[in-house]
Design a protein with these regions (language model features):
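Short acidic, hydrophobic short linear motifs in intrinsically disordered regions
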Residues: 197-203
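Class I SAM-dependent methyltransferase SAM-binding "motif I" and its flanking Rossmann-like core
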Residues: 1-69
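Charged, amphipathic alpha-helical regulatory modules used
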Residues: 187-188
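Mobile late-domain/C-terminal helix-loop "cap" segments
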Residues: 192
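A contiguous loop/helix-start segment that scaffolds small-molecule binding in enzyme catalytic cores
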Residues: 6, 68-183
């Protein structure tokens, strides 16, 4: 990011005198997730708690939005020697929208010397031992821990019978859920039709 910012502001263009190569790699959150199971199977987002370059109100807004949206969260830079209250405040924001029992994984130095993995829950997050080398994975409403593995279901159980594999009542294989976009719109239209005056304002 900073490399491109400096180059572009200095008048550099792709194909110019300075060659830039971006080599893809494994992100910290992916490495950490692989050590605890499959917590990122469904939608997720990453948020840094460092306010060295980002105002805290922006960080807080992102935390609240992610929690309301039921995203699995990966928190970077959760705590440092000087930033001791940021994780406490983040926990407070998240608990407005998540149960205290929500599974949490804390991974330190994934695949490096000093690696450590700790499973806990959101209600105990602020008391956990962690620092700048730690990444925090916070589950969504469906995430669970079983036999030491943190798993976020992809959602197949909502659509298919776990034993037979057949679509559940009202669902069709290869089609959107009954409450996918089209189904949801149809349900809203039906509700509006039943309301007096049939207007959205009545909703």
């Amino acid at each position: 990011g900073p490399t491109y910012e400096v180059l572009l502001r200095s008048g550099w263009h792709p194909g110019g005198d300075i060659e830039v190569e971006v080599i893809p790699g494994i992100t910290s959150l992916s490495a950490c997730a692989s050590l605890v199971g499959a917590p990122l199977t469904h939608d997720f987002c990453s948020i840094s708690l460092s306010d060295l370059l980002t105002p805290w109100p922006v960080i807080a807004q992102r935390l609240a939005a992610a929690a309301r949206g039921d995203f699995v969260l990966a928190l970077y830079s959760p705590r440092s020697g000087r930033r001791t209250q940021h994780l406490v405040e983040a926990q407070r924001i998240l608990l407005r929208h998540r149960q205290a029992e929500t599974p949490v994984a804390i991974v330190k130095s994934a695949y490096r010397e000093g690696q450590a993995v700790h499973l806990t829950h959101l209600g105990a997050l602020a008391e956990a031992q962690l620092g700048m080398l730690s990444t925090v994975l916070i589950g969504n409403a469906s995430t669970y821990v079983q036999d030491g593995l943190m798993v976020t279901p992809r959602g197949y159980a909502q659509k298919y019978d776990a034993i037979t594999g057949d679509p559940r009542s009202g669902e069709r294989a290869g089609r959107s859920l009954s409450l996918g976009l089209e189904g949801w719109q149809a349900a809203i239209r039906e509700q509006i039709g039943h309301l007096q005056g049939g207007s959205l304002a009545a909703l």
